[in-house]
């Protein structure tokens, strides 16, 4: 994806990038075997501080995943929603998380997913200066060559609440989905909570 956006490298037909955030143990126990059975790859955005803790993958499991179809990248150090915490913590969350994960993996960590997608221009600057090549949000949409490398959209699929029709709509109607989500957030931010909750968001 980076080579496509930065250098114009041709993509395969019907390209898709599959990502998983946080690093829960089911990524190792359930997702990895499924990916292997279909000869597919994915990226796991790992919370550095969660490695070797309850409900999350271990360092050894990350190494196995990295060797069998998963690219391991960063989801910050402690999974703090960056725009809601003291800016003095941003470097530790972004660069500190990268450094810690590189220590576990023994390889460069190039990409970041912001927790909750929350970011701003200063966070993007720190991300770039920390050595990341791209960073991802949860703003719904498909990636285009004109996109900001440090605020790339994704299509969120959540466990248990995404039936096939919703999944299909998110894939094929991303601009409309993005508009409805943004409208929902605007209504909620301006006190129209009930109306926001009534919106069909797919």
Regions found by a protein language model. Give the residues of each.
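Active-site beta->alpha N-cap acidic-glycine motif
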Residues: 1-68
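C-terminal active-site subregion of NodB/CE4 polysaccharide deacetylases
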Residues: 1-19, 25-28, 80, 84-202
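Histidine-centered catalytic micro-motifs
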Residues: 20, 71-79
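Glycine-enriched alpha-helix->loop->beta-strand junction motifs that scaffold or abut catalytic
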Residues: 38-41, 68-72, 128-135
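Short beta-strand and adjacent tight-turn residues that come in two discontinuous sequence segments
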Residues: 45, 75, 135-137
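Short, flexible active-site-adjacent loop segments at beta-strand->alpha-helix junctions, enriched
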Residues: 48-50, 76-78, 156
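Generic alpha-helical hydrophobic packing signal
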Residues: 63-68, 75, 90-91, 126-129
């Amino acid at each position: 994806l980076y080579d496509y956006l930065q250098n114009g490298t041709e993509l395969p037909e019907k390209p898709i990038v599959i990502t998983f955030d946080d690093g829960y143990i089911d990524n190792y126990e359930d997702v990895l075997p499924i990916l292997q059975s279909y000869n597919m790859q994915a990226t796991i955005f790992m919370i550095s501080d969660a490695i070797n803790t309850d409900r999350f993958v271990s360092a050894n499991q990350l190494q196995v995943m990295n060797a069998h179809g998963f690219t391991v990248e960063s989801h910050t150090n402690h999974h703090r929603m960056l725009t809601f915490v003291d800016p003095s913590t941003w470097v530790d969350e972004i660069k500190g998380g990268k450094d810690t994960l590189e220590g576990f993996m023994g390889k460069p960590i190039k990409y970041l997913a912001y927790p909750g997608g929350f970011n701003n221009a200063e966070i993007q600057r720190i991300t770039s200066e920390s050595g990341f090549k791209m960073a991802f949000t949860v703003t719904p949409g498909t990636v285009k060559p004109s996109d900001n490398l440090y605020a790339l959209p994704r299509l969120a699929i959540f466990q248990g609440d995404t039936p096939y029709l919703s999944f299909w709509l998110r894939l094929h109607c991303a601009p409309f989905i993005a508009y409805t989500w943004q409208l929902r957030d605007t209504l909620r931010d301006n006190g129209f909570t009930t109306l926001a909750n009534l919106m069909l968001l797919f």
